[in-house]
């Protein structure tokens, strides 16, 4: 039994060492294609070291005006290492029926969205793609509607999860972002 315990301990130490040497945190260990783009990007490689807010979005939802607050947060804090990543989803009420090109045009022309938007994806628990499945597991909650917000610290660890009714510019969210930015 001791050899098995030793192997287990060495395995845990190897994983910890890999993360310490620039390995990827589980919440960012995914390749995702930018909206209306062709080549996936490794989230870990691009966003490592930043405070990241991941949001499932929709263009025809009562919460759609949250795009404005998300863009304002991004504009205010991006120079300090904060980024919003939007993932359109048609899972809740069929409220994101458009093509990726239509979604991109809507976001830019209606809300001036400049934060990164990614491929249309499944965010709901039943069909969650691997990114949202991992976030749901880490948070202990999956999006129940559009505009669920997951906040990751600079190491890619889940720091908070906010439901659709919590506005991106709410005091609770802003204070958490500022605490994570910490500078």
Language-model features: locations:
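Boundary at the C-terminal end of the N-terminal hydrophobic targeting segment
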Residues: 18-24
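A short beta-strand-turn-helix
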Residues: 30-51, 72-77
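Thiol-/selenol-based redox modules, centered on thioredoxin-like
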Residues: 130-183
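Loop/turn elements at helix/coil->beta-strand transitions in domains of secreted/extracellular proteins
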Residues: 48-52, 79-83, 111-116, 146, ...
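Bacterial N-terminal signal peptides
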Residues: 7-16
